[in-house]
C-alpha cells in the first residue's frame, strides 16, 4: 500500500516525493555550484555561458518541462525532445530553431544531453533578443519572465503566464534533481519577476468572470479547441480512463488548444498541487481513447510513464476526488471495472498510466480511503 506523503509549501511547481525532486517544504539548501563535476552540470554551465543565459534559469525551465529526464530521446505528447523539451510540430519548431542556432543535427538535439541543453539555451537567448533584453537585462533573473512565457509556446496568455509562474516558483523554492545519476541543484532565491504585459493577464486559476467550473466544481474551465473534440455523445458515460500526459501541465493544456493536435481529454491534473483544468464538457466526446471515446471521461495526469517523481500524493488525492465525483454523478462503478488505464481500452496502443501508477492506492482514495 502506498503511504500518503504530504506536500507542504509548494504551489505551482513540479514537486515530487522521491529523490529526483524539488525539496518540498523548503528551498534547496546550500549554494548551487554551476561548476559542479559531471556532464549535466557541465552542460548547463557551458550552455549558460555560451548564450549568456542565467544557468539557474536554464535548469528551472528544464525541470519544469521534464524533471531533467530526457526519456531516451522519446517524444512527448506534442513531439518535444530532451530535458529542454525542444519541440517539432505543426505549430512549434523549437527543435528546428535550435538546430539553426547551434549547427547541431536534429538527432543529437533529441538524444544527447549536452546538445539538447545547449539547444534550449540557444532558443532562450534568441527569445531574449526578440524581447529586447540587453546585456544588463540578461543578468537579472526577473527580466527573463516574458522570455520564459514565450518559451512555453502557449497561444493562451493565461497558460503562458502559468508556465512562467511555475519556473519562477522553482527558482524561489529551489531545485534538487537527478539527471542521469548526477545531482543538479538550484538554490532557492528571491526573484522579483518583471512580468511586463503579463502583469495584466488574469491567472488561469482566477475564478472571477468567465473562468469557472463547467461540470466538476473544483476545476478551472479552459476549453480545448473545438477542432479537437466532438459535440455530444453517442453512448452513455460508463468509464473513467486514466492517462499520463507525457508532457507538462501547461504544455498539455496548450496542445489541446492547438487545432492541429486532433486530441483532447476532459480533465488535466497538475503534479505539484493537484490543480485540475477542465477542457471538454462531460457531455461532449473528447478524443483521448479511440474506441473508448463515446462512453468515457478522460483524465490526463501531468508527467511521464517512466518517471514516478511526477505522481505526487497531491495529484493522486485531487484526481481521486474528481473520479469519485464522476462515479457518483454518472453511476460508474468505483472499481477497476469502471476506472481503467488508457492501455486497457480496446483498440489502443498506448501504455499509460504505466507501471508506476499505484492503482491500489488510487482506488482506495476513490472509495474514501
Can you describe what each PLM-predicted range is?
Residues 1, 5, 163-220, 308-369:
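Basic/polar, cationic surfaces and motifs that engage anionic cell-wall
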Residues 1-32:
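Secretory targeting and sorting signals
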Residues 34-170:
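Catalytic glycan-binding domains that act on GlcNAc-containing polysaccharides
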Residues 37, 43, 184-290:
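N-terminal catalytic cores of peptidoglycan-degrading enzymes
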Residues 50-54, 77, 116, 140-142, ...:
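Extracellular/periplasmic catalytic domains that process cell-envelope and extracellular macromolecules
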Residues 57-60, 85, 239-244, 264-270, ...:
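Structural recognition of the beta-strand scaffold that forms the well-ordered cores
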Residues 64-69, 89-94, 127-130, 154-158, ...:
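Solvent-exposed loop/turn segments at secondary-structure junctions
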Residues 71-77, 160-164, 182, 252-255, ...:
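Short, solvent-exposed loop/turn and secondary-structure capping segments
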Amino acid at each position: 500500500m502506498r503511504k500518503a506523503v504530504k506536500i507542504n509549501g509548494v504551489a505551482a511547481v513540479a514537486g515530487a516525493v522521491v529523490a529526483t525532486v524539488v525539496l518540498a517544504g523548503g528551498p534547496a539548501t546550500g549554494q548551487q555550484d554551476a561548476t559542479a563535476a559531471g556532464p549535466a552540470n557541465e552542460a548547463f554551465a557551458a550552455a549558460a555561458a555560451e548564450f549568456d543565459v542565467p544557468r539557474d534559469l536554464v535548469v528551472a525551465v528544464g525541470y519544469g518541462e521534464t524533471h531533467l529526464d530526457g526519456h531516451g530521446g522519446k517524444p512527448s505528447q506534442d513531439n518535444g525532445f530532451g530535458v529542454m523539451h525542444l519541440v517539432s510540430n505543426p505549430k512549434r519548431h523549437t527543435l528546428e530553431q535550435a538546430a539553426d542556432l547551434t549547427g547541431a543535427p536534429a538527432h543529437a538535439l533529441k538524444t544527447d544531453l549536452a546538445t539538447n541543453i545547449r539547444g534550449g539555451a540557444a532558443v532562450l537567448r534568441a527569445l531574449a533578443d526578440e524581447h529586447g533584453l540587453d546585456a544588463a537585462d540578461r543578468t537579472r533573473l526577473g527580466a527573463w519572465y516574458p522570455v520564459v512565457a514565450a518559451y512555453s509556446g502557449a497561444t493562451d496568455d493565461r497558460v503562458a503566464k502559468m508556465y512562467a509562474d511555475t519556473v519562477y516558483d522553482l527558482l524561489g523554492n529551489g531545485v534538487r534533481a537527478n539527471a542521469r545519476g548526477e545531482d543538479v541543484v538550484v538554490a532557492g532565491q528571491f526573484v522579483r519577476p518583471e512580468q511586463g504585459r503579463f502583469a495584466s493577464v488574469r491567472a488561469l486559476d482566477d475564478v472571477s468572470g468567465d473562468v469557472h467550473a463547467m461540470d466538476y466544481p473544483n476545476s478551472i474551465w479552459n476549453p480545448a479547441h473545438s477542432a479537437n473534440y466532438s459535440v455530444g455523445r453517442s453512448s452513455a458515460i460508463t468509464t473513467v480512463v486514466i492517462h499520463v500526459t507525457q508532457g507538462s501541465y501547461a504544455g498539455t493544456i496548450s496542445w489541446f488548444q492547438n487545432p492541429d493536435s486532433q486530441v483532447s481529454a476532459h480533465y488535466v491534473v497538475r503534479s505539484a498541487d493537484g490543480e485540475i483544468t477542465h477542457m471538454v464538457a462531460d457531455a461532449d466526446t473528447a478524443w483521448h481513447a479511440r474506441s473508448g471515446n463515446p462512453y468515457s471521461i478522460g483524465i490526463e495526469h501531468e508527467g511521464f510513464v517512466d518517471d514516478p517523481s511526477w505522481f505526487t500524493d497531491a495529484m493522486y488525492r485531487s484526481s481521486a476526488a474528481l473520479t469519485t465525483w464522476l462515479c457518483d454523478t454518472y453511476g460508474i462503478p468505483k472499481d477497476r471495472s469502471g476506472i481503467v488505464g488508457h492501455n486497457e481500452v480496446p483498440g489502443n496502443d498506448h501504455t499509460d498510466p504505466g507501471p508506476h501508477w499505484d492503482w491500489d492506492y488510487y482506488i482506495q482514495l476513490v472509495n474514501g480511503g
